[in-house]
Design a protein with these regions (language model features):
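Glycine-rich NAD(P)-binding loop of the Rossmann-fold in SDR/ketoreductase-type enzymes
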Residues: 51, 81-92, 129, 133, ...
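Conserved Rossmann-fold NAD(P)-dependent oxidoreductase catalytic core, especially the SDR/UDP-sugar
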Residues: 92-134, 148-149, 156
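N-terminal Rossmann NAD(P)H-binding glycine-rich loop of SDR-like oxidoreductase domains
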Residues: 4-24
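NAD(P)H-binding glycine-rich loop region in Rossmannoid oxidoreductase-like domains
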Residues: 37, 47-85, 96, 114-116
């Protein structure tokens, strides 16, 4: 039975990747600093850091496929540590994969490598990268390492938009709290921008296909195939869950003037990438995904929001969870918005 190693397999996306590869008939080996919430049949867990070459070599032994998904995420606000984990960790993983003669190496990157779009055109794999914050820069550098290794290793890159699905909390917990109480929903700008999301299941499917189909040296942008403007998607979501919240736009200039200061004072959980693109049209073309992997993402933006919200209602989250994507966000001063009439 083929073995796939998934780094960061205990986190939000890692859980979906594990389920996908188990369904494909693989044995799954997870390498993570944290144990998974549950260990299913067919799953082996190794606790360790992707920067530890000895542990990485042990985890890579006998593996057919490596999915390198481990990373420090933006909500951690980890500064210089982004490069240490996301770049150096990728370098260690690539070396281990080459030494172990792995059949396939897939790197899970991020849409943040493109920075803030300067127009409303769809982002393609040929669009120039222009990251501006530590997380996006670290992901772009890690991508370069992967591309440089493609002569020695069958490597592909999966680049998701903002990932959503049942089990995802983080920033979404603030939105869902407003919806649950029929409170106003605050957005940056007027909401007429197209803002694409992607379902965790669709990302996992793209990774699975890239592990099986010939796509050496290829990168794939992955995002929803069906979505409208931010306002349209939120309105459709609210109707689906029987919510009567009013969507209220906050002037973008005001948010961009105040949020950096609040961030420095540790009063806001938002990072610069989030509030600099929130009112922009940001979406991937999925043509390459459809052409080479013959895959069309299944879920629309509003369907993702609806499914994630219903999960939120049915599953109280663990406030002590170490995964920043799987526990409610500390809203900081933003929690006061709930009391604005």
């Amino acid at each position: 039975m083929p073995i796939v190693l998934i780094t960061g397999g205990s986190g939000f996306l890692g859980t979906y990747l594990t389920e996908r590869f188990l369904a494909d008939g693989h044995t799954v080996r997870i390498l993570d600093v944290l144990p998974p919430e549950k260990v299913s049949t067919g799953v082996e867990f190794i606790q360790g850091d992707v920067r530890d070459s000895e542990i990485v070599a042990k985890a890579s032994a006998g593996v057919n496929v490596i999915v390198h998904n481990a990373a420090l995420v933006p909500l951690s606000k980890s500064g210089d540590a982004f490069r240490d984990v996301n770049v150096r960790g990728t370098s260690v993983m690539l070396k281990a994969a080459i030494d172990a003669k792995i059949n396939k190496f897939i790197f899970v990157s991020s849409s943040s490598v493109y920075g803030v779009p300067n127009n409303s055109d769809p982002i393609t794999e040929e669009t120039a990268q222009n990251p501006f914050e530590a997380y996006g820069i670290s992901k772009a550098e890690a991508e370069t390492l992967c591309q440089n290794a493609k002569d020695a290793l069958d490597v592909s890159i999966i680049r998701p938009r903002t990932i959503l699905g049942p089990g995802r909390m983080g920033l979404m917990s603030l939105l869902f709290d407003w919806v649950e109480t029929n409170h106003r929903i605050y957005i940056l700008g007027n909401g007429n921008n197209r803002y694409q999301l992607v379902a965790a299941e669709d990302v996992a499917e793209a990774v699975s296909l890239a592990s099986r189909l010939p796509c050496r040296g290829q990168d794939f942008n992955v995002g929803a195939d069906r979505f409208g403007t931010l306002r349209e998607d939120l309105e459709q979501f609210c109707r689906a869950v029987g919510n009567k919240s009013k969507i209220v736009g906050v002037p973008s200039w005001l948010a961009r003037a105040t949020l950096p200061i609040l961030g420095l004072l540790r009063l806001s959980p938002l990072v610069s990438y989030q509030y600099r693109i929130a009112d922009k049209t940001v979406y991937f073309s999925t043509e390459k995904l459809k052409t080479i992997l013959s895959f069309t993402p299944k879920y629309s933006n509003s369907e993702m929001l609806t499914r994630a919200y219903r999960w939120y209602k049915d599953h109280p989250t663990d406030p002590n969870s170490a995964s920043l994507h799987r526990k409610k966000m500390n809203a900081g001063i933003l929690r006061l918005l709930k009391y604005v009439p």
